[in-house]
């Protein structure tokens, strides 16, 4: 097999690959064995048609696509290795020659990982954030806990107020016609949560249980359902019930409900302070680590291919969907409630995706420049920590993980960031 790599403008290039005729014939043989299983001719059972009759009846060309499916993946992988390139996109394959008894010649146009020209990455100056925990911080955390333990109590009298939960029926109309997803019964809506279209919740304020009302709103221009985007709508709403939050008293009993390890409210406050101090310390350390990476990446010269940003955006979108599912939602519901669509969300994520790609490429280049690598011992230590945190044996964890490349890569990036922090100046 012969391989030629031609660099084009930017980060693109073309591999020209020639696979010898002997390998092509092996590919055709394998393709025939696969295809003939479903072929029958007069006098021959399915799968028993001789090769010579098959080619006479259908032509050897009938085997080409299956042969290519067999030959191309291995040939492309070997060509990439031989050329010493790192593709970041799927190849655009162009078959130049495919004939029985001749070599296979194909071109593969790909985008490759860009060259990184490192700038300053040692001696970076970063600021450490204040880790002081104030009494106000403790009180704010206590108030949030109080909110979490609040009970919803039906308001026998009074009207809907901000922060209340209204149990409603609603049906929406655009141009006098109902639309899909615009109707629900006994829906619990927290007023002020921003769950519904802008203006909807505000117009419920002041309503009483049993009251009906027509609400006028306009769908956002970027609303995910194009047929509704930017259009005025009328919602018929009926309030069945109004519930208000009833906060528990901040006393020793509340403290014991929140944390069974404490006996008094003062003990709970002390524990909250300790946790906040630990959280702020971790936050400060993470901020320093992020800052040195961001500065090193900003100092590097990199022509980032659009496909790498797109791939990272895809990954971020999957991560976001997974987080939503853990909260009992999904992307479609998010689009419905937020008024966004996938294109708008992708655009919103694009800047962060590019920063992530730039940071990863920079860290990779620094690790190479400083000969930072990971030993088997370090990998085993990391696996032991992970196994302990999941209450698993190391062998079981390895079985679940399978390929350990991801673990090694994470460790390598962590060591590289450690290096940057050690060689930076952190101002208090």
Swiss-Prot record:
A Pfam family reported for this protein in Swiss-Prot or TrEMBL: FKBP_C
Location in the cell: Cytoplasm
Class of enzymatic activity (EC top level): isomerase
A biological-process GO annotation: protein transport
Domain PPIase FKBP-type: 163-248
PROSITE patterns, sorted: FKBP_PPIASE
Record-level Gene Ontology MF annotations: peptidyl-prolyl cis-trans isomerase activity; protein folding chaperone; ribosome binding
Superkingdom field: Bacteria
Keywords: Cell cycle, Cell division, Chaperone, Cytoplasm, Isomerase, Rotamase
GO CC term (a single one): cytoplasm
Reaction(s) this enzyme catalyzes, per UniProt: [protein]-peptidylproline (omega=180) = [protein]-peptidylproline (omega=0)
E.C. numbers: 5.2.1.8
Domains as described in the record: Consists of 3 domains; the N-terminus binds the ribosome, the middle domain has PPIase activity, while the C-terminus has intrinsic chaperone activity on its own.
Cross-referenced PANTHER family: TRIGGER FACTOR CHAPERONE AND PEPTIDYL-PROLYL CIS/TRANS ISOMERASE (PTHR30560), TRIGGER FACTOR-LIKE PROTEIN TIG, CHLOROPLASTIC (PTHR30560:SF3)
Family: Belongs to the FKBP-type PPIase family. Tig subfamily.
Stated role: Involved in protein export. Acts as a chaperone by maintaining the newly synthesized protein in an open conformation. Functions as a peptidyl-prolyl cis-trans isomerase.
Protein's name according to its UniProt entry: Trigger factor
Source organism per UniProt: Geobacillus thermodenitrificans (strain NG80-2)
């Amino acid at each position: 097999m012969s391989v030629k790599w031609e660099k084009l403008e930017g980060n693109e290039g073309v591999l020209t690959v020639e696979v010898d005729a002997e390998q092509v014939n092996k590919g055709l043989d394998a393709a025939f064995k696969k295809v003939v299983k479903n072929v029958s001719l007069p006098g021959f059972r399915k799968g028993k048609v001789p090769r010579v009759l098959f080619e006479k009846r259908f032509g050897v060309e009938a085997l080409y696509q299956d042969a290519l499916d067999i030959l191309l993946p291995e040939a492309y992988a070997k060509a990439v290795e031989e050329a010493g390139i790192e593709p970041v996109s799927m190849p655009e394959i162009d078959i130049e020659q495919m004939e029985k008894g001749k070599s296979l010649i194909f071109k593969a146009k790909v985008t490759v990982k860009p060259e990184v020209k490192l700038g300053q990455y040692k001696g970076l100056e970063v600021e450490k954030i204040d880790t002081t925990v104030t009494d106000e911080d403790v009180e704010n955390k206590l108030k949030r806990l109080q909110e979490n333990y609040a009970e919803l109590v039906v308001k026998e009298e009074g009207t809907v107020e901000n922060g209340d939960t209204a149990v409603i029926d609603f049906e929406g109309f655009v141009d006098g016609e109902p639309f899909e997803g615009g109707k629900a019964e006994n829906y619990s809506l927290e007023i002020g949560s921003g769950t519904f279209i802008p203006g909807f919740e505000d117009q419920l304020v002041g309503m009483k249980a049993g009251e009906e009302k027509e609400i006028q709103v306009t769908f956002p221009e970027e609303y995910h359902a194009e047929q509704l985007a930017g259009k005025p709508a009328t919602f018929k709403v009926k309030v069945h019930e109004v519930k208000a939050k009833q906060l528990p008293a901040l006393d020793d009993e509340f403290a014991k409900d929140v944390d069974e390890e404490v006996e008094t409210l003062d003990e709970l406050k002390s524990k909250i302070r300790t946790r906040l101090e630990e959280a702020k310390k971790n936050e400060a350390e993470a901020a320093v680590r992020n800052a040195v990476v961001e500065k090193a990446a900003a100092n590097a010269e990199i022509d980032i291919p659009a496909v790498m940003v797109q791939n990272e955006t895809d990954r971020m979108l999957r991560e976001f969907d997974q987080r939503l599912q853990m909260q009992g939602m999904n992307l479609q519901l998010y689009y419905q409630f937020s008024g966004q669509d996938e294109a708008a969300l992708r655009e919103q994520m694009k800047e962060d995706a590019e920063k992530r790609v730039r940071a990863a490429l920079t860290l990779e280049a620094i690790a190479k420049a400083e000969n930072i690598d990971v030993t088997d011992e370090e990998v085993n230590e990391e696996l032991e920590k992970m196994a302990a945190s999941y209450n698993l044996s190391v062998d079981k964890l390895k079985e679940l993980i399978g390929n350990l490349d991801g673990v090694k890569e994470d460790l390598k990036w962590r060591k590289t960031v450690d290096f940057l922090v050690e060689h930076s100046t952190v101002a208090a």
